[in-house]
């Protein structure tokens, strides 16, 4: 019997990867970011400056459904008053360290089991994620030996589109040669992920209620998923 769905797209933050707030790790990242930038400011003050400058960038990104690559992010938005030659050279590492300031990211419990299980069952796998930083995800996939399981990795920082923009799903479908209705989306944000996936015509939407997101949510016809799961391994029961 032919499967109803042929591909599964995973969101990252709060879905396939969970951020754990480990203060020593985060403090090291704040210190490292200041060191890389070559600032004379105390590292905590430098971090606060970046946070303040990030707010107008975030407002633009959310409003326009766009994302800057590393060079534009740091040279235009976050450190326009620093040496552009130096910042261009270190922009990828700055993005990586800035994200580590928010926590240490680890694969969700059961995540590797689900990836390998779906791959064995013949599903094409992809990642569609809104995030800054062009290199972190490819580096992580390679280091963890997971890169061979994914047929496409769509990052907003690389394609310069953000969910809920439906075109980001269209791009993923085109890259692996499947129709939107043949795809499953696994994500955690009903407003951003469900809206974009439904607009793109994704066939099935699964919302994962990750450990740090247990607050009540209200579903409407626009954002109602097909499944809500609290254990990531439940995906293997949904997709034969």
Protein language model annotation of sequence segments:
Residues 1-8, 20, 35, 41-44, ...:
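Asp-based, Mg2+/Mn2+-dependent phosphohydrolase catalytic module
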Residues 2-109, 113-121, 134:
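N-terminal helical cap/lid subdomain that shapes the substrate entry/recognition surface
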């Amino acid at each position: 019997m032919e499967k109803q769905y042929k591909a599964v797209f995973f969101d990252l933050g709060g879905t396939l990867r969970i951020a754990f707030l480990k203060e020593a790790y985060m403090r090291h990242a704040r210190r490292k970011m200041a060191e890389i930038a070559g600032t004379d400011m105390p590292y905590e003050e430098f971090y606060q400056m970046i946070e303040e400058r990030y707010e107008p960038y975030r407002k633009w990104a959310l409003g326009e459904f766009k994302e800057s690559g590393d060079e534009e992010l740091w040279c235009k938005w976050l450190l326009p008053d620093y040496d552009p030659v130096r910042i261009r050279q270190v922009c990828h590492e700055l993005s990586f360290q800035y994200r580590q300031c928010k926590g240490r990211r680890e694969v969700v419990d059961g995540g590797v089991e689900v990836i390998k299980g779906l791959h064995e069952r013949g599903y094409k796998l992809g990642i569609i994620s809104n995030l800054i930083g062009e290199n972190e995800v490819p580096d992580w996939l390679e280091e963890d030996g997971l890169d061979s399981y994914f047929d496409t990795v769509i990052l907003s920082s690389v394609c310069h589109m953000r969910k809920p923009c439906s075109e980001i799903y269209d791009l993923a479908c085109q890259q692996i040669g499947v129709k939107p209705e043949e795809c499953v989306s696994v994500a955690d944000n009903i407003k951003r992920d469900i809206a974009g996936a439904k607009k793109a015509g994704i066939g099935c939407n699964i919302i994962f209620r990750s450990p740090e997101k247990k607050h009540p949510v209200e579903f409407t016809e626009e954002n109602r998923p097909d499944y809500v799961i609290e254990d990531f391994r439940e995906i293997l029961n949904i997709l034969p």
